[in-house]
Amino acid sequence: KHQDKFSKADKEKLDQYFTSIRELEKRAEQSRNWLDKPKPSTDYVLSDEVDSLDIAQRMKYYYDLMVLALQTDSTRVISLSFSALGPNYGGFTGVSHDYHTLSHHGNVPETMEELLIIEKAYMEGFAYFLDKLKQIKEPSGKTLFDSTMSLFGCGMSSGNSHSNRNLPVVLAGGGFKHGEHKKYERSN
């Protein structure tokens, strides 16, 4: 009966307000339902021997942990930095210096070859992670890969010159068109 006293604009404003409140209540209810939903189980057994693993095995171990965290919805955002994964020289066969030192290669072929060993291992580790995501089916029928965006990159395209121009990155997963290589002009 009080609505008769309001102008049309006031009625629309009130309707908008009450609709917003109802939508917020619905979202809160959905959140409550999510809280009681049991997390998926997994049969993966984590190694007790992490410290004794070589760098390639340690990368796989951390990628396995990341997959499990995403699979069980324990988190939705993960960041992994390789600098903390190995000893000073990276733990790679054929590598005699740490990554940072090698990145300032001075165009010396031997140094660049060592850097390539590390970067190849990093890319193989990322491919391993993506393959694991593709193997896990979700209740929706999609794979975990389809429901995840994974970004792989570095802060510099050339540590030799401290340049971040033409910075190569890989973005993989769901939610966008695949199979493209983008090359942008330097002015961008």
Where are these regions (language model features)?
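Ligand-binding pockets and gating/stacking loops
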Residues: 1-188
